């Protein structure tokens, strides 16, 4: 939700309050997906729990219309994010299970790009809507979106996932592997820098005088190139290992976040930085998701994706979003974005030195 921070700012919340509220989406990812992931792995009924989580996400969000204080919005956002944060890992697990069964792992990016297309449409439309109708129009648009997600859950065929092995194995031996720890740590460092981006980028641009339409356009540029990289990923994965893709993505992240902080007054540089989103999110996400699927399989696949979401987007995102809010108070927006480039820089060396696997995606 690239404009949610702007809506919260319109309610006269300060940077620390906005950071705390937006970090609820990341904090909920630490524990909520693991509960539903465990239930889904036990039953194999992923679609059933996608329906449940999307239903409660929609119902709870309606409470935002009667909330204008920090405490009230905190309660609504926390309750809603518990369910919405659980939907995506379940959908990822279902998708990867289907692709793995057909030995078409590299096709994941072609499916994921539809989410990016939806983001572009939403970013452009909402930017214009906010310019014309004000920030409050955002909550009506988001309510409609939540309802559509709920309806789409019922279009999915009621298929139960059958695991290739019936033996119940503990997940702890997988979690204790050095390569798994290294992968999750480097992913968390990458997402920490993005936590700052997702929470404060729109506010940063608005404070620099950019219009809602311009902000929407910049977000859309990033996601447009994200779609392009998704289309190219099968070819990229046929030539590079997943580790190489992750390292290249981390390198681009260092450059991107420094540029955002140092040259926010240059639209050309900002566009260049947004183009790098293709690597810092697009290729990085595809490669990390497939490595997680490589380590966590069969009856652990939903929990594997949930743990990935919890540690990277949960812990990592919360550190970046909440910690970023505190840093902005003392260092300012521009300096905080430049400093955030240190996180993927560390992640690069953690991954380079600690991940030894040469695993490549299965192609078909």
Predicted regions and their residues:
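Helix-loop boundary and gating motifs at the non-cytosolic
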Residues: 1-29, 179-218
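Juxtamembrane intracellular "pre-TM" segments in multi-pass secondary transporters
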Residues: 154-187
């Amino acid at each position: 939700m690239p404009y949610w921070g702007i809506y919260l700012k319109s309610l006269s919340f300060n940077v620390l309050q906005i950071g705390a509220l937006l970090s609820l989406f990341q904090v909920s990812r630490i524990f909520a997906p693991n509960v539903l992931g465990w239930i889904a792995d036990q039953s194999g009924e992923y679609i059933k729990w996608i329906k449940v989580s999307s239903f409660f996400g929609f119902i709870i969000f309606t409470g935002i219309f009667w909330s204008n204080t920090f405490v009230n919005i905190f309660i609504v956002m926390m309750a809603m994010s518990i369910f919405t944060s659980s939907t995506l890992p379940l959908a990822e697990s279902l998708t990867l299970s289907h692709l793995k069964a057909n030995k078409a792992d590299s096709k994941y990016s072609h499916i994921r790009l539809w989410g990016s297309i939806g983001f572009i449409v939403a970013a452009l439309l909402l930017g214009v809507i906010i310019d014309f109708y004000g920030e409050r129009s955002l909550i009506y648009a988001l309510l409609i979106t939540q309802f559509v997600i709920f309806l789409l859950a019922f279009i999915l065929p009621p298929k139960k996932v059958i695991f290739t092995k019936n033996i119940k194995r503990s997940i702890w031996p997988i979690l204790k592997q050095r390569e798994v720890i290294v992968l999750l740590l480097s992913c968390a460092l990458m997402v920490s820098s993005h936590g700052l981006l997702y929470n404060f980028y729109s506010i940063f641009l608005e404070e620099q005088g950019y219009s809602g339409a311009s902000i929407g356009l910049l977000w859309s540029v990033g996601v447009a190139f994200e779609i392009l990289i998704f289309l190219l990923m099968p070819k990229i994965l046929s030539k590079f290992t997943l580790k190489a893709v992750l390292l290249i993505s981390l390198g681009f992240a260092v450059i991107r976040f420094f540029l955002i902080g140092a040259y926010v007054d240059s639209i050309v540089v900002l566009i260049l930085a947004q183009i790098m989103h293709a690597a810092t999110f697009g290729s990085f996400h595809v490669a990390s998701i497939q490595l997680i699927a490589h380590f966590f399989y069969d009856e652990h696949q939903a929990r594997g994706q949930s743990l990935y979401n919890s540690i990277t987007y949960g812990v990592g995102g919360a550190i970046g979003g909440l910690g970023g809010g505190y840093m902005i108070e003392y260092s300012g927006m521009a300096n905080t974005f430049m400093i955030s480039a240190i996180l993927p820089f560390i992640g690069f060396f953690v991954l380079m030195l600690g991940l030894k696997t040469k695993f490549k995606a299965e192609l078909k």
